[in-house]
């Protein structure tokens, strides 16, 4: 049975104790108990008579008053479910185990067996392929070469140059049911790959050998993804859903597995044996194990034991929407799989961001469920505290892809003693295990003093384990195959989905409807935008201005119709972004087999139809009669129907683009390309008669062509157009002759052909959307990248050699003395603070001197305006105080820990001291070495390592440090000294092996979390600061990584700097590395400020001296103990106020005296003074910003290379579509075709540039906020660098486009005309790109920037002078024509090309006259137009720079 699968859950909510009989003062026994029992017995008897199907859907529910009634369990409401759980599990820690035992007892009583799964893996090897060294960096050059190389490899023309990268190497083992297995190993040891292999979820691109079996069955005999559950370390959720909704959706999709059958069998056997179960357990099991319920008791149970009840109805949130905390999100990821029926759980790093007590409670709940209900679990944890480690039965230790140990927890230390290594007393066993295989850390644990130490490789450990008694026993067990006949029939699932397809479609539809309600702002905004655009269009094409006398009048009407098509089509563009935003969670659910892709695709289409109806109705009702289209109700409704089809077709097309592109930049580029083809081939820009024969297929497949034909026929075959023009030579009506002149079929049936074709496209695009969802995988999978050093080191460690790594930046004599042990990105840890005295003296004499400074602060208070939500809850104060009178002193060479529970104000205090707060009210005094703190000078001598490691993604580690040092070290420091100093810092922070590694985006590519943390520290250190603040430098790291970072921090302190760290949950050895502690309690009050002492002796002595505080247990972590005894609950229980106790202590008086002493400047000292605000001159700042942007652009091929390729393809496409049209000047239509080519190119290339630059600027802006706060440069040099780097790329874009198109379209080859063509194209692309930058600079994020900019494109398009020439615009709108940038571009392009040509057209006017009469463009005005375009570019540049300088959207 999948019995209790939902019971594998977890907890953190501690509720007040009591059991069901103590829950109220009401007398439950007000009637005689016999009477109540008799009544209940009668109800049970009645229930027993029902057939099994009905019996397992009904139960006896006890009310709050103690009365019982029969209920249908599928209709329990939230309150009833909550009361039921309250009775079963009052306090999670205490009652969950009792409840599970009751459940198991009920099953055992009738002799039912629960299904169990034993997972075996034999000789499992997994290999990937990786590029090595600089070829792995994603530069524009490598990007192009790699595409060619992969293509030639595919054709077997070139050999594969990628290096094999072994991830797992010949591992074997058994995971037994009913036992908890802990998976440990340093980073990059293959933990995630092993878990994915066991869960049957390995990537298809990996080479896999060996086999994984469940109960002896191979993976192809059952559905592994549903028999087991893999819980990823990445938290991918839909931000707009609440926690409860997320879990309920998951439970609804996964179903109950075989539990329904087991429940039926249990009920049948109980009836036969005449056993009456506990009514509460009975109702819980029936409610949890019945199929197809939307609101399930399992969801409530999971929320309870995971401690998520407090945020059950809070939105999950994402980077744009505030929601639950990181720790709660992590628990939600765990809960999402636990509500399902899987019997085997593979959990990857489920404790990141959780404090140790929450982790303990969650693991303990899982353990209870695994032990009692015989589940199978493998859990990998980063930093398990000793008490959590002790919950496990078995340990698997992985290192370098090999198993070093697998077996009972009790024997693991015995194995390492057998190898000669002993775990020290004050060291967590888990931390010891992660370090003992590492080259850097192994020696300190060597216990055989009589023998000389020699590094023992992972392979040697692995071979020794085979000979160890545990290893031999494992080998013997593997030699005997699993007896398949013993496998429970319900253990392995063979059905692909958890519930029926109909039920899954209902679940997806309900969720999509919910998301549409939550995203209603987008739809309302689109309707407002459409209403606004309709108002402008109405007044521009006002019927009083619209005549029906000539074909030119027809052109204006056609312009209005074409614009309506464009507006309705582009209104669906938001679908593209909305689709891509939901893709990460979709891929997760799809791969976990929650639902088939079509069940997701169908609701996203069907539910949008009503919105389409409303949007199109708004447009048609507002514009149809006001513009003066054919006054016929039938034609009105036909236009309405047609535009509905267009909107649906466009939405389907954009969704398809999103599903094909899967990345916002690629999808935008790709989407623009398709749209361009659809529009150019639509028949308005280029008439059918002029389409080249090699492109005519494009005309016939363009949906826009069918829309254009149908909407034109609907209008021009009406009565108003049925007259013959007065001086016409033919007998054709005006409508027919106009349609013919534009290459449109003048046949009424074309309306229905067009509408039918559009409906066909609606179905086609939505079908292809579902297909793309089914078969494509997430975009940009993390690429394996190897440095040459890593390859050399891997090979050496296999042979058991020790190698020397690049000792760059050292003199030859120093290289000789300094025999470095090998270090790589994976083996970098040693005991925290393990620096020898010789090292220390060397470190203190770093190349650049600095002035040691102390910082003192007295009575610091910080408050913010009271949030509206709190005022609504009845808080009357105007301000909410977050810090209340905090005082202290931080001194050089002393490492201070800033600690407290979540919400105590640790980061707030740090931000206040560092001057990083952007709002709020600050009181109190802060002094630097006795002088009052001045923020301008302080920023020059202080470093601040933020918790979020924000760095430019496309530069290398060395370049990041170079940039920081260049801008922050004083001008006097020459280049050679600066480089030596950077090398020293890299040596200190152990970054030398990573010098050429790309930083990358967190969680996507580049550096690991721990390497990022060290880079953050190094970036601040190269500024040579005297004071460094670090916010949570070890959160999210495993024990070894945390030790590396803390050793880095300790090394920094030992150079004589003042360092302060906020820290969340330190292990014993990390806590021991600190010298002093400032402890805050919730509410921002201090409760201990002072030295820690050896092994925290001073801290322990202080707290144990307080009455009622329990003594610390031997070997217990002092940090954990201290947080437990000072918690709010503990403070209440003791009746103490720790703040008052501290303020009345001797310690407080000593601190006050120290603050007073350090607040007076030393006699020979002087206040900090710098002649300028920034270290470097304005010119140097500009050059540095330009240098960084150069590398950022060069290594960002999805932006730069794709843009150049896009331009190249567009140029070829335009050249072939408009082939030789520039030289034809017989008819007006010839000129309009050539002008159409200019119009569409300007619009598309421009909008494409503006759209793709936005995400790039948005990512760089977050880095800019950090760098500006650090005092590196002012806003102007940043804006300069950002704009200057665009110029060469724009020039390349213009040359590629200009030369190809100019030659192919056949414009006149004179130097002046060619120069003007390139000039106008260059400045047009420039102002569009600057416009994209500007919109990001004035908005908080790039989504809002995209919405705002797209609103303007629509207006610019309307007023550019192509759809409606200036001469036909009403007087009241002409002013907008003059401020529309595109109108000046078209003026320049058209007037410079055609404004001086004297050839005569078929209408007997010259080209020059036609251009002047139709557009009002004059050739001699071209020079002024050029100046206007330069002016527009300068204006946008100025707004961008001004906004970047003035607006700060980062709130702290």
Swiss-Prot record:
The keyword Signal does not apply. It is found in: Cell membrane. ATP binds at residues 185-192, 900-907. Expressed in root hypodermal passage cells. Expressed in stem tissues, particularly the vasculature and nodes adjacent to leaf axils. Induction: Induced in roots by auxin, phosphate starvation, treatment with the synthetic strigolactone analog GR24, and colonization by the arbuscular mycorrhizal fungus Glomus intraradices. GO terms for molecular function: ABC-type transporter activity; ATP binding; ATP hydrolysis activity. Residues 808-830 are annotated as: Disordered. Residues 152-425, 855-1107 form the ABC transporter domain. It is a multi-pass membrane protein. Residues 504-716, 1180-1394 form the ABC transmembrane type-2 domain. Keywords: ATP-binding, Cell membrane, Membrane, Nucleotide-binding, Repeat, Transmembrane, Transmembrane helix, Transport. One of its GO terms (biological process) is regulation of secondary shoot formation. Disulfide bonds: none annotated. It comes from the Eukaryota. GO terms for cellular component: plasma membrane. Residues 812-821 have a biased composition (Basic and acidic residues). The keyword Transmembrane applies. Disruption phenotype: Enhanced branching phenotype. Defective in strigolactone exudation from roots, and reduced symbiotic interactions with arbuscular mycorrhizal fungi (AMF). The chain crosses the membrane at residues 521-541, 554-574, 609-629, 640-660, 664-684, 694-714, 753-773, 1199-1219, 1239-1259, 1287-1307, 1314-1334, 1344-1364, 1375-1395, 1421-1441. It holds the Pfam family ABC_tran. Cellular strigolactone (SL) transporter required for the exudation of SL from the root to the soil. The presence of SL in the vicinity of the roots is required for development of symbiotic interactions with arbuscular mycorrhizal fungi (AMF). Transports SL in the above ground tissues and is required for the control of shoot branching. SL regulates plant shoot architecture by inhibiting the outgrowth of axillary buds. Involved in the regulation of shootward and outward directional strigolactone transport in roots. Belongs to the ABC transporter superfamily. ABCG family. PDR (TC 3.A.1.205) subfamily. This is Pleiotropic drug resistance protein 1.
């Amino acid at each position: 049975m999948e019995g209790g699968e939902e019971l594998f859950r977890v907890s953190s909510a501690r509720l007040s104790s009591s059991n069901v009989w103590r829950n109220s003062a009401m007398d439950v026994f007000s009637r005689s108990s016999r009477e109540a029992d008799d009544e209940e017995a009668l109800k049970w008897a009645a229930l027993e008579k029902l057939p099994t199907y009905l019996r397992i859907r009904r139960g006896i529910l006890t009310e709050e008053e103690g009365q019982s009634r029969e209920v249908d369990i599928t209709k329990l409401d939230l309150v009833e479910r909550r009361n039921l759980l309250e009775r079963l599990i009052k306090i999670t820690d205490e009652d969950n185990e009792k409840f599970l035992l009751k459940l198991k007892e009920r099953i055992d009583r009738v002799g039912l067996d629960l299904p169990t799964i034993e997972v075996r893996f034999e000789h499992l090897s997994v290999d990937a392929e990786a590029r090595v060294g600089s070829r792995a960096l994603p530069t524009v050059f490598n990007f192009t070469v790699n595409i060619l190389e992969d293509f030639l490899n595919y054709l077997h023309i070139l050999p594969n140059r990628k290096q094999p990268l072994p991830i797992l190497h010949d591992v074997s083992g058994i995971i037994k049911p009913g036992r908890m297995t802990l998976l440990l190993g340093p980073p990059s040891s293959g933990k995630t790959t092993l878990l994915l292999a066991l869960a049957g979820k390995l990537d298809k691109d990996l080479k896999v050998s060996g086999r994984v079996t469940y109960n002896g069955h191979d993976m192809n005999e059952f559905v592994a993804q549903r028999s087991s559950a893999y819980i990823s370390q990445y938290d991918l959720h839909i931000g707009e859903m609440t926690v409860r909704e997320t879990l309920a959706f998951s439970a609804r999709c996964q179903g109950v597995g075989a539990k329904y059958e087991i429940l039926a069998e249990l009920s049948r056997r109980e009836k036969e044996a005449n056993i009456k179960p506990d009514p509460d357990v009975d109702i819980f099991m029936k409610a949890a194990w019945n199929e197809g319920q939307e609101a399930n008791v399992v969801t409530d149970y999971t929320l309870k034991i995971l401690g998520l009840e407090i945020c059950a109805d809070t939105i999950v949130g994402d980077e744009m929407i505030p929601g639950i905390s990181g720790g709660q999100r992590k628990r939600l990821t765990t809960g999402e799989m636990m509500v399902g029926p899987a019997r085997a759980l593979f959990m990857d790093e489920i404790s990141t961001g959780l404090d140790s007590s929450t982790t303990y409670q969650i693991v303990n709940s899982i353990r209870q469920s695994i032990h009692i209900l015989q589940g199978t679990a493998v859990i990998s944890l980063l930093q398990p505290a000793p008490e959590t480690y002790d919950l496990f039965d078995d340990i698997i230790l992985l290192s370098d892809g090999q198993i070093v140990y697998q077996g009972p927890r009790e024997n693991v230390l015995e194995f390492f003693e057998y190898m000669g290594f002993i775990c020290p007393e004050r060291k967590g066993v888990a931390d010891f295990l992660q370090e003992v295989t590492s080259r850097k850390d192994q020696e300190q644990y060597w216990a055989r003093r009589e023998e000389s130490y020699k590094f023992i490789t992972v392979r040697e450990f692995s071979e020794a384990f085979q000979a160890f008694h545990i290893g031999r026993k494992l080998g013997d067990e593997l030699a005997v195959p699993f007896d398949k006949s013993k496998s429970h029939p319900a253990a392995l699932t063979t059905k692909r989905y958890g519930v029926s397809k109909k039920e899954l479609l209902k679940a997806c539809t309900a969720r999509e409807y919910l998301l549409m309600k939550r995203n209603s702002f987008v739809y309302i905004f689109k309707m407002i935008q459409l209403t606004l655009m309709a108002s402008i269009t109405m007044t521009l094409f006002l019927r009083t201005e619209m005549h029906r006398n000539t074909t030119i009048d027809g052109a204006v009407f056609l312009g209005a119709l074409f614009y309506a098509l464009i507006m309705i089509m582009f209104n669906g563009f938001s679908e593209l972004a909305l689709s891509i935003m939901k893709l990460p969670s979709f891929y997760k659910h799809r791969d976990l087999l929650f639902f088939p892709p079509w069940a997701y695709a169908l609701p996203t289409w069907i539910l949008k139809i009503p919105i389409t109806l409303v949007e199109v109705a708004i447009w048609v009702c507002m514009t149809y009669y006001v513009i003066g289209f054919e006054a016929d109700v039938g034609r009105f409704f036909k236009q309405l129907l047609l535009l509905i089809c267009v909107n649906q077709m466009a939405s389907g097309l954009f969704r398809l683009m999103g599903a094909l592109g899967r990345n916002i930049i690629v999808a935008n580029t790709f989407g623009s390309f398709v749209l361009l083809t659809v529009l150019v081939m639509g028949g308005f820009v280029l008439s059918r008669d002029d389409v080249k024969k090699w492109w005519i297929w494009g005309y016939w497949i363009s949906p826009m062509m069918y829309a254009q034909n149908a909407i034109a026929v609907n209008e021009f075959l009406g009565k108003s157009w049925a007259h013959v023009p007065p001086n016409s030579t033919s007998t054709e009506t005006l409508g027919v002759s106009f349609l013919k002149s534009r290459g449109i079929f003048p046949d009424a049936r074309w309306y229905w052909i067009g509408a039918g074709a559009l409906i066909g496209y609606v179905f086609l695009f939505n079908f292809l959307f579902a297909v793309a969802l089914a078969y494509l995988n997430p975009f940009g999978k993390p690429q394996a990248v190897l440095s040459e050093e890593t390859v050399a080191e891997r090979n050496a460690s296999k042979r058991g050699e020790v190698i020397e790594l690049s000792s760059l930046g050292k003199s030859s004599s120093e290289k000789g003395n300094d025999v470095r042990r090998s270090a790589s990105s994976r083996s970098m840890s040693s005991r925290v603070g393990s620096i020898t005295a010789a090292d220390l003296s060397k470190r203190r004499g770093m190349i650049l001197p600095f002035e040691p400074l102390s910082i003192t602060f007295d009575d610091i208070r910080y408050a913010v305006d009271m949030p509206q939500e709190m005022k609504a809850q009845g808080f009357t104060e105007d301000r909410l105080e977050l810090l209340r009178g905090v005082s202290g002193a931080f001194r050089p060479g002393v490492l201070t820990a800033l600690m407290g529970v979540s919400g105590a104000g640790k980061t707030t205090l740090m931000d206040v001291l560092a001057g990083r707060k952007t709002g709020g009210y600050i009181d109190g005094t802060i002094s630097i070495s006795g002088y009052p703190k001045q923020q301008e000078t302080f920023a020059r001598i202080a470093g601040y390592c933020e918790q979020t490691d924000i760095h430019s993604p496309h530069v290398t580690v060395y370049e990041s440090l170079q940039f920081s040092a260049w801008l922050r070290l004083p001008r006097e420091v020459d280049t050679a000294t600066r480089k030596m100093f950077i090398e020293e810092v890299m040596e200190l922070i152990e970054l030398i092996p990573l010098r050429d590694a790309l930083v990358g985006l967190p969680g996507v590519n580049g550096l690991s979390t721990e390497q990022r943390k060290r880079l953050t520290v190094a970036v601040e250190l190269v500024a040579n600061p005297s004071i460094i603040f670090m916010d949570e430098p070890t959160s999210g790291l495993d024990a070894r990584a945390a030790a590396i970072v803390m050793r880095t921090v300790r090394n920094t302190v030992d150079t004589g700097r003042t360092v302060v760290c906020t820290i969340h949950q330190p292990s014993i050895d990390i806590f021991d590395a600190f010298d002093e502690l400032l402890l805050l309690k919730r509410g921002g009050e201090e409760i201990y400020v002072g030295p820690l002492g050896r092994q925290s002796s001073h801290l322990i002595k202080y707290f144990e001296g307080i009455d009622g505080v329990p003594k610390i247990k031997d070997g217990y972590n002092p940090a954990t103990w201290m947080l437990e005894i000072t918690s709010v609950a503990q403070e209440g229980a003791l009746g103490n106020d720790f703040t008052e106790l501290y303020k009345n202590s001797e310690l407080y008086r000593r601190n006050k005296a120290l603050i007073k002493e350090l607040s007076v400047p030393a006699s020979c000292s002087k206040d900090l003074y710098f002649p300028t605000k920034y270290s470097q001159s304005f010119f140097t700042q500009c050059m540095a910003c330009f240098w960084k942007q150069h590398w950022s652009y060069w290594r960002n091929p999805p932006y730069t290379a794709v843009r150049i390729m896009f331009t190249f393809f567009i140029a070829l496409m335009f050249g072939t579509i408009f082939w030789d049209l520039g030289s034809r000047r017989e008819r007006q239509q010839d000129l309009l075709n050539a002008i159409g080519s200019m119009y569409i190119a300007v619009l598309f290339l421009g909008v494409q540039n503006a759209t793709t630059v936005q995400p790039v600027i948005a990512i760089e802006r977050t880095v800019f906020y950090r760098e500006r706060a650090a005092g590196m440069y002012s806003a102007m040099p940043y804006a300069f660098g950002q704009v200057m780097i665009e110029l060469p790329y724009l020039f390349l874009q213009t040359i590629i486009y200009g030369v190809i198109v100019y030659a192919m379209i056949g414009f006149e080859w004179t130097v002046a005309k060619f120069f003007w063509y390139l000039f106008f194209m260059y400045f047009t692309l420039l102002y569009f790109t600057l416009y994209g930058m500007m919109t990001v600079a004035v908005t908080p994020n790039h989504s809002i920037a995209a919405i705002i900019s797209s609103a303007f494109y629509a207006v610019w398009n309307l007023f550019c002078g192509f759809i409606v020439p200036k001469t036909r615009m009403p007087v009241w709108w002409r002013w907008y024509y003059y401020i529309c940038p595109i109108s000046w571009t078209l003026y320049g392009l058209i007037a410079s090309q055609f404004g001086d040509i004297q050839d005569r057209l078929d209408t007997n006017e010259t080209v020059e006259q036609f251009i002047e009469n139709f557009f009002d463009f004059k050739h001699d005005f071209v020079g002024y137009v050029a100046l206007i375009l330069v002016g527009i570019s300068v204006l946008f540049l100025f707004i961008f720079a001004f906004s970047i300088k003035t607006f700060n959207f980062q709130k702290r």
